[in-house]
Amino acid sequence: MTLRFPRFSQGLAQDPTTRRIWFGIATAHDFESHDDITEERLYQNIFASHFGQLAIIFLWTSGNLFHVAWQGNFESWIQDPLHVRPIAHAIWDPHFGQPAVEAFTRGGAIGPVNIAYSGVYQWWYTIGLRTNGDLYTGALFLLLLSAISLIASWLHLQPKWKPSVSWFKNAESRLNHHLSGLFGVSSLAWTGHLVHVAIPGSRGEYVRWNNFLEVLPYPQGLGPLFMGQWNLYAQNPDSSNHLFGTSQGAGTAILTLLGGFHPQTQSLWLTDIAHHHLAIAFLFLVAGHMYRTNFGIGHSIKDLLEAHIPPGGRLGRGHKGLYDTINNSLHFQLGLALASLGVITSLVAQHMYSLPAYAFIAQDFTTQAALYTHHQYIAGFIMTGAFAHGAIFFIRDYNPEQNEDNVLARMLDHKEAITSHLSWASLFLGFHTLGLYVHNDVMLAFGTPEKQILIEPIFAQWIQSAHGKTSYGFDVLLSSTNSPAFNAGRSIWLPGWLNAINENSNSLFLTIGPGDFLVHHAIALGLHTTTLILVKGALDARGSKLMPDKKDFGYSFPCDGPGRGGTCDISAWDAFYLAVFWMLNTIGWVTFYWHWKHITLWQGNVSQFNESSTYLMGWLRDYLWLNSSQLINGYNPFGMNSLSVWAWMFLFGHLVWATGFMFLISWRGYWQELIETLAWAHERTPLANLIRWKDKPVALSIVQARLVGLVHFSVGYIFTYAAFLIASTSGKFG
């Protein structure tokens, strides 16, 4: 018999229907379920695939550098970052007529180009790159790293180089290596790059390999380090009239604590950033020496966890048994990693706009909007994935005997209390927030806007005041000149910080009012509901009231209606599926809020947001409808313009999104009948009946159809909003 796809499952390979193809694709990466898999091969396959992942990342970033160097305008952008539009790459399209060629020829290019809204120009400029030659060098270096990663991937699948299971389960060594070796050393290396290359570059000094050893990053070199006079490195910082990239107004300090932003670039001081990375490096280098390995010093994580027993005996056995549970479950480890990474990605979104690290990126409004939205969506998908793998852990890896009465077992014992509290919080937030919005809508509709219920977010304003924002008049902590906190930081970072937080042109601690209060609670509703669905799905994954133990049922059985006893309540896969809709919904509200608030800030009409955001019609009319005018005008009676591609994508995104419903609201029997009718017609049509297929066509399973629907819904939703965001922002600000 010839070997058919999928090779990893003989059972599936012999399936006579098209199910073989779909199930093969669905389980291709589920190594645990493959024929002849052993624990050792499982770990080795995943380890090797990590190097493949790195190779793809390096290749992709190399491509970014290469295309900007080849087709971009990096060198002319550097001369005037605020007015030259950065080019991502050229467009080669044989369908372009003269109007299209003219519309897309911009940024000083000779032909049609795409504008870069990714912030790479600002990033590369900040870290000291200055010429196309630098970009080509970077591209080649990353290409080399990509090749090395691929070789490493292949090498670690060869018999001599395959690591053993015990090597993979040596948690202490891995933690030490990752903390010290990856985070610590790389942060130290990055500090070195900033001090030796980026900071001199920002002061007009071009440091490369040929003069790297001759140019002192600091006049006295390492003298102050060895003499213990570290404060010298902070003396004589760049002045407030420093022109970035030149020696005008430049200082000599390399590690500072100035606080606030560089007045010209509106980004954090490079010397502050270098100082931050040095501190991070120190912390992680220390942290990476905490755990006991071959040398017999440091802590054993197992001993630490076993000792974590709550006193008094009423809270169970604490962390007993957790070490082996986590160390033997890849899904548990992946869940923890995804949860951490998801939070970090969302924090990146928040901090990239409020504390911009890259020169001039704060004045590139479209890039700011694109980066915020991008990182929030990525965070949403990663965080839902954390709970999916948490659920799979309970089904495949959880052993009740090993975890008796510890925190995991007790969490399962209390799951009704956990889910009911989350449910109550979600209902409370939902009804109250919607009630306020709808009340305000009705008042506006009846012409009595003064009867709206408008609530000032006084607690949030108090927190902002504590951080130094003076406009609310709270006079507390950093906003009070008499407080000890104020006096403690007055001589170092505080003046710069206070200047930044009270400056109305940046995004640091934006002024908030009743509209913010409402949308904050709408977002809280979305977050709590998403969390409720995900937490319930994970906690009920192994067993719930209807089905006490689902271990043999697996993860992805469908919610199948009342016909089979009602499995809607108890499918972990279905909880994940539902949660993704809520996640997208929530991030929609988050990005709408961020974007509208910033558009009004950038245009200087914040009163529009303040007045229109307190009722739903305001959001629909003054944010969505008003800002979609650019998309509707991509093609108009005067021809086309550079927004037409976004207008097209806006329509296309809606189409993909709507197609999702064809799969989501459907009955499987209908599809099966339709397929068989089509197959019957095909077989009875001359010429067409010459083509036969080996697999009998069958309708998608319930879970598959849901997945296909969810993918269309998600992709369409994101495409639609991406087009709206970029067109409405770039149409206003260029």
UniProtKB/Swiss-Prot annotation:
Q: How is the cofactor bound?
A: P700 is a chlorophyll a/chlorophyll a' dimer, A0 is one or more chlorophyll a, A1 is one or both phylloquinones and FX is a shared 4Fe-4S iron-sulfur center.
Q: Name one GO biological process term.
A: photosynthesis
The lineage's top-level taxon is Eukaryota
The answer to whether UniProt assigns keyword Isomerase to this entry is no
EC nos: 1.97.1.12
Regions crossing the membrane: 46-69, 135-158, 175-199, 273-291, 330-353, 369-395, 417-439, 517-535, 575-596, 643-665, 707-727
Q: Give residues annotated as binding chlorophyll a B3.
A: M662, Y670
- Record keyword Metal-binding present: yes
One of the record's GO cellular component terms: photosystem I
Main location, first listed in the record: plastid
**Catalytic activity field:** reduced [plastocyanin] + hnu + oxidized [2Fe-2S]-[ferredoxin] = oxidized [plastocyanin] + reduced [2Fe-2S]-[ferredoxin]
User: Pfam families given for it?
Assistant: PsaA_PsaB (PF00223)
Record localization? Plastid, Chloroplast thylakoid membrane
InterPro entries from the UniProt entry? PSI_PsaA/B, PSI_PsaA/B_CS, PSI_PsaA/B_sf, PSI_PsaB
Residues involved in chlorophyll a B1 binding:
H654
Q: Where does [4Fe-4S] cluster bind?
A: C559, C568
Membrane-topology descriptor: Multi-pass membrane protein
UniProt: phylloquinone binding residues: W671
**Cross-referenced SUPFAM superfamilies:** Photosystem I subunits PsaA/PsaB (SSF81558)
Please list the GO terms describing molecular function: 4 iron, 4 sulfur cluster binding; chlorophyll binding; electron transfer activity; magnesium ion binding; oxidoreductase activity
Q: What top-level class of enzyme does the UniProt entry assign? A: oxidoreductase
What keywords were assigned to this record? 4Fe-4S, Chlorophyll, Chloroplast, Chromophore, Electron transport, Iron, Iron-sulfur, Magnesium, Membrane, Metal-binding, Oxidoreductase, Photosynthesis, Photosystem I, Plastid, Thylakoid, Transmembrane, Transmembrane helix, Transport
Role of this protein: PsaA and PsaB bind P700, the primary electron donor of photosystem I (PSI), as well as the electron acceptors A0, A1 and FX. PSI is a plastocyanin-ferredoxin oxidoreductase, converting photonic excitation into a charge separation, which transfers an electron from the donor P700 chlorophyll pair to the spectroscopically characterized acceptors A0, A1, FX, FA and FB in turn. Oxidized P700 is reduced on the lumenal side of the thylakoid membrane by plastocyanin.
Subunit and interaction comment: The PsaA/B heterodimer binds the P700 chlorophyll special pair and subsequent electron acceptors. PSI consists of a core antenna complex that captures photons, and an electron transfer chain that converts photonic excitation into a charge separation. The eukaryotic PSI reaction center is composed of at least 11 subunits.
Family per UniProt? Belongs to the PsaA/PsaB family.
> What is the protein's name according to its record?
Photosystem I P700 chlorophyll a apoprotein A2
